[in-house]
Swiss-Prot record:
Organism: Mus musculus
Principal location class: nucleus
Protein's UniProt name: Ribosome production factor 1
Any one annotated GO CC term: nucleolus
Underlying gene: Rpf1
Entry-linked Pfam families: Brix (PF04427)
Keywords of the record: Nucleus, Ribosome biogenesis, RNA-binding, rRNA processing, rRNA-binding
Superkingdom classification of source: Eukaryota
Length: 349
């Protein structure tokens, strides 16, 4: 009898729930009719309450749907805020406040104590006494030897040949198993001022060694994103023999200043502007982008550029005093990722 009584009580509860559920739509309809008659619109319920978390939804399809709606709602709110701000600026006219500068990794860069001041006497003294002083004093003219690692493949060979058309008075030499320590004395004896070695891995150029002769320094770079002339879309005709102009961007620290002077010493002093050719080394976030362009003058006020190629990206790995010596060489700077790459806003060049 007790069990039967419990069942009847449970059945009564279920009946009350069904009755309440049936009455709720009727009450909502009556409330809507009342607001329509009075002319007052009901307040919209918040689509996403403050304590709501989409990640708590267990159903994957429902969770994806709610996330899409949330993104759409955010996009609408952002667009409405932009329109409102635009109207306010138009209403203020000239009195409108200046637009805020967007935050980027570059303009939020951590200040480096070694940033070079061009007017500093110490910097001027270092420039007058360093290994590149003879070049900048016009006592020597650059003469470059370009070589590769042992048994180079076609892509690396073509890159060397194209580099020799970019850098004036440069000569390509294939090593044939000769060690770098034996090549350097021969280069010095033949009055070469710089040695460029392009390394490869799996038939792809992946490294560049630049050694200034006869007393160094020697820089080792990682090379990536190599594009030869045939791989560049809408490229111009092959470069002429005119001496190109050189542009160095964003080499601001003492280390970057040294690297910039190394690149500058590869090209002669007096560019032939009639050739309209320019070689650019652009440093951005410690990546050095190399591009070779030709100016296209459309009118007296308009000018365009046409890429000639090749193009590649360099990342400095080490800077060594003196010429190349992998065993006993003294390093001025070595890139140590675990110790140096602690912040995305800290750069070394």
């Amino acid at each position: 009898m007790a069990k039967a009584g419990e069942k009847s009580v449970g059945g009564g509860k279920r009946g009350l729930k069904r009755k309440a559920a049936a009455e709720e739509p009727q009450e909502a309809a009556a409330a809507s009719d009342g607001t329509a008659e009075s002319g007052v619109q009901p307040a919209k319920a918040a689509a996403f309450p403050p304590g709501f978390s989409i990640s708590e939804i267990k159903n994957k399809q429902r969770r994806h749907l709610m996330f899409t709606r949330w993104k759409q709602q955010q996009r609408k709110e952002k667009l409405a805020a932009k329109k409102k701000l635009k109207k306010e600026r138009e209403a203020l006219g000239d009195k409108a406040p200046p637009k805020p500068v967007p935050k980027t990794i570059d303009n939020q860069r951590v200040y480096d104590e070694t940033t070079v001041d061009p007017n500093d006497e110490e910097v001027a003294y270092d420039e007058a006494t360093d290994e590149f002083a003879s070049y900048f004093n016009r006592q020597t003219s650059p003469k470059i030897l370009i070589t590769t690692s042992d048994r180079p493949h076609g892509r690396t060979v073509r890159l060397c040949e194209q580099l020799s058309t970019v850098i004036p008075d440069s000569h390509v030499y294939y090593r044939r198993g000769l060690a770098l320590k034996k090549i350097i004395p021969q280069c010095i004896a033949r009055d070469f001022t710089d040695l460029i070695v392009i390394n490869e891995d799996r038939k792809t150029p992946n490294g560049l060694i630049l050694s200034h002769l006869p007393n160094g320094p020697t820089a080792h770079f990682k090379m990536s994103s190599v594009r030869l002339r045939k791989e560049i879309k809408r490229r111009g005709k092959d470069p002429t023999e005119h001496v190109p102009e050189i542009i160095l961007n964003n080499f601001t620290t003492r280390l970057g200043h040294s690297i910039g002077r190394m690149f500058a010493s590869l090209f002669p002093h007096n560019p032939q502007f009639i050739g309209r050719q320019v070689a650019t080394f652009h440093n951005q976030r410690d990546y050095i982008f190399f591009r070779f362009h030709r100016y296209i003058f459309k009118s007296e006020k308009k000018v365009g550029i046409q890429e000639l190629g090749p193009r590649f990206t360099l990342k400095l790995r080490s800077l060594q005093k003196g010429t190349f010596d992998s065993k006993y060489g003294e390093y001025e700077w070595v890139h140590k990722p675990r110790e140096m790459d602690t912040s995305r806003r800290k750069f070394h060049l």
